[in-house]
Amino acid sequence: MNQTLLSAFGTAFERVENAIAALREGRGVMVLDDENRENEGDMIFAAETMTVEQMALTIRHGSGIVCLCLTEERRKQLDLPMMVENNTSAFGTGFTVTIEAAHGVTTGVSAADRITTIRAAIADDAKPSDLHRPGHVFPLRAQPGGVLTRGGHTEATIDLVSLAGFKPAGVLCELTNDDGTMARAPECIAFAREHNMPVVTIEDLVSYRQAQERKAS
């Protein structure tokens, strides 16, 4: 990742700390991955705090595929089958079947309906019957171990919201340009500045977590 672009957001450690602080304040975060991987930026939010306005922003400026990152434990609690048995996607992205809240939504497409679906899925006492399948929210199963196991946006989202003190559930969506192309680092950084989002890379988060583990041992 081009460090010149990122230097305005502090050191790698500071970028992670700023991301954690933003999530605690109810703001979104821009998470960039490696230029040699997907080379994209995802807007991420804590599932517990995401607002209808933030969802509307995400739908308006994102790919439209709004994903709810969950742990394997939560996936089992909700009895969500994986979308395919044999995952042949380039990065092994862990999509489950799509979901909709069983109650409190109309078509399920609006920002408010998607928030209702997310709240239903992350409720402490959530059960499979609280959700209909398919729907307009795309759950993603994170790998245990987070970014230290898999350097994906799914795991980064779970790691960041957990570090911020929230339950391990977060929302992500890839940022796109107005012409429909994928936003790359310069566009992602400009968007983040405009919308008061800190910028952090998955590489930053890997380093941060490795340092945490060294300290703990």
Curated annotation (Swiss-Prot):
Q: Under which pathway is this protein filed? A: Cofactor biosynthesis; riboflavin biosynthesis; 2-hydroxy-3-oxobutyl phosphate from D-ribulose 5-phosphate: step 1/1
Q: Which reaction does it catalyse?
A: D-ribulose 5-phosphate = (2S)-2-hydroxy-3-oxobutyl phosphate + formate + H(+)
Q: Provide this UniProt record's keywords sorted from A to Z.
A: Lyase, Magnesium, Manganese, Metal-binding, Riboflavin biosynthesis
Q: Which residues are involved in binding Mg(2+) 1? A: E38
Q: Which domain of life is it from?
A: Bacteria
Q: Does the keyword DNA-binding apply?
A: no
The positions annotated for binding Mg(2+) 2 are E38, H153
Recorded E.C. number(s)? 4.1.99.12
List, in alphabetical order, the Gene Ontology terms for molecular function in this entry.
3,4-dihydroxy-2-butanone-4-phosphate synthase activity; magnesium ion binding; manganese ion binding
- Textual note on the cofactor: Binds 2 divalent metal cations per subunit. Magnesium or manganese.
Q: Name the protein family.
A: Belongs to the DHBP synthase family.
Q: Which PANTHER family match?
A: 3,4-DIHYDROXY-2-BUTANONE 4-PHOSPHATE SYNTHASE, GTP CYCLOHYDROLASE II-RELATED
Q: What is this protein called?
A: 3,4-dihydroxy-2-butanone 4-phosphate synthase
Organism for this UniProt entry: Cronobacter sakazakii (strain ATCC BAA-894)
